[in-house]
Amino acid sequence: MANIKSAIKRAKTSEK
C-alpha cells in the first residue's frame, strides 16, 4: 500500500 502513501506525499509536495 505504499502506492497511496507515495501519492499523498507527492500531492503534499506538489501543493508547495
Curated annotation (Swiss-Prot):
Positions in coiled-coil regions: none
Single GO MF descriptor: rRNA binding
GO cellular component entries: ribonucleoprotein complex; ribosome
Keywords: Ribonucleoprotein, Ribosomal protein, RNA-binding, rRNA-binding
Family per similarity comment: Belongs to the bacterial ribosomal protein bS20 family.
Function: Binds directly to 16S ribosomal RNA.
Protein name in the entry: Small ribosomal subunit protein bS20
Encoding gene (name): rpsT
